[in-house]
Amino acid sequence: NLPMDVRFMLPSCVPATPLDEAGAVLDYRAIDPFYEHPRVQGLAEMMNYVGAVAADSQVLEKITAAQAHHKKIDGHAPGLKGMELNAYLAAGVYSDHECYDMEDALNKLRLGQYIMIREGTAARNLDALIPLLTPQYADRCMFCSDDKHPSDLLEKGHIDYHCRRAIAQGVDPIIAVKAATHNAARYYQLNNRGAISPGYLADFAIIDDFDHFHVQMVFKKGKLWYDGQVKPFSAPPIEETLVNRARDTFHLPRLKLE
């Protein structure tokens, strides 16, 4: 009951590769029950594009399970093209965030994928993909960070940084804001969000201008929650055992010089 939305995509590749060691092996049976949770939007980036193209049974089980729940399936297909890209899309992967240049992005757009324009800490693709933010292509584009360090979030911002940087390079502010809000909401089937209109939840922010994107006010479901400071709200108590588990996760024996 906090005044915010936090939504999830279920992991598609744990472990990340067959040779990797992880805390668990998550097949489709392990993740399938979580699709019933109202905050789960779909299956996260299908990194095993080789398995999808090769019709690996475990990969296809995860994809078909997501489809059975009418959920989105995000992609991860750097450089994939031709018949392999066709096969990947035919499996039911709806988006990709691994586009490094316009050629790759246009190949995927023409085949029906949505493009997540990534600007993170390590991978930074926004400048190369700025031409996507035009009326011809923008309706099937949205922003993502993929991986961004906390220090970068504090110093530069998150999706607001995408907007500032895109607008500074000449992108129409309406197109930039739409990629950050409306397009993402439509893609993830959050059909009562992403716009200010009758029938929509009144979730919106008021900024100072399109150059700085300093947030002045934040409304959630029509209620003002921030106007320079966060309004008081009641939060459920956090179990101490959960706090301790989150903090006590890294264990090494005492190191010696030799």
Located regions from the model:
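Histidine/acidic-residue-rich catalytic or RNA/ligand-binding cores of hydrolases
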Residues: A55, G82-L89, L111, N125-A138, ...
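Structural recognition of alpha->loop->beta junctions
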Residues: Y28-G42, Y88-N107, A138-M142, V171-D172
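Divalent-metal coordination cores built from histidine and acidic residues
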Residues: N1-K72, Q136
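Short acidic/histidine-rich active-site segments
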Residues: H76, H97-E98, M116-A122, Y137-G157
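Active-site microenvironment of metallo-dependent hydrolases
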Residues: L154-G170, I174-E258
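Structural preference for beta-strand elements that scaffold enzyme active sites
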Residues: D5-R7, V40-G42, K72-D74, Y94-S95, ...
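Divalent metal-binding pocket/active-site signature
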Residues: E45-M102, E119, A123
